[in-house]
Amino acid sequence: QPDAVVFAGDIYDRSVPPVEAVALFDDFMTQLRAALPNGEIMLISGNHDSAQRLDVFRSELSDRGIHMIGNPPMQKGETIERVTLTDDFGAVNFYLLPFVRPGMVRLVTGTKENGDNLSYPEAFSRLLALSPLNPDERNVLVSHQFFLPDGGDAENIERAENEVKQVGNLDAIPASLIADFDYGALGH
């Protein structure tokens, strides 16, 4: 039996899903919890989800081992949500970082000197710096961004039909920014 189940977004395919989709997800989560009564369930929002809707009951669900994270850190003092599991080899830290747009996190990451939002890589890098990793433990990033291998050409990456392509692929984040993690559970 697994110790955890991780969903790296999207939960739904649109920000306001149909009632049937919400009911289906509710049924799925009920069955998953029944099948995994003592395991941790971790979910983050993706670019198609409504982060605010997924954050409803966040604290209550977390107390029950269901970590459904809609919004990234958006206020000063907030950090990336971390869930720590332990096994015979020590701690495994899961850092739950939902889909991020630089404007969403400007109160946490700051802005450029002229007041403009940071680039996607700059904002993402500053968010990661909020939660320093312990190199003596295993660290897993759960994220839903558009990562590219260093030197990769975003023009050659196929995207889903309903996915908005940023002009010049400004949303691309170099994979080197997550090199300190032992594993990346990356959604899309």
Where are these regions (language model features)?
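Extended recognition/assembly regions associated with phosphoester-bond processing machinery
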Residues: 1-7, 11-186
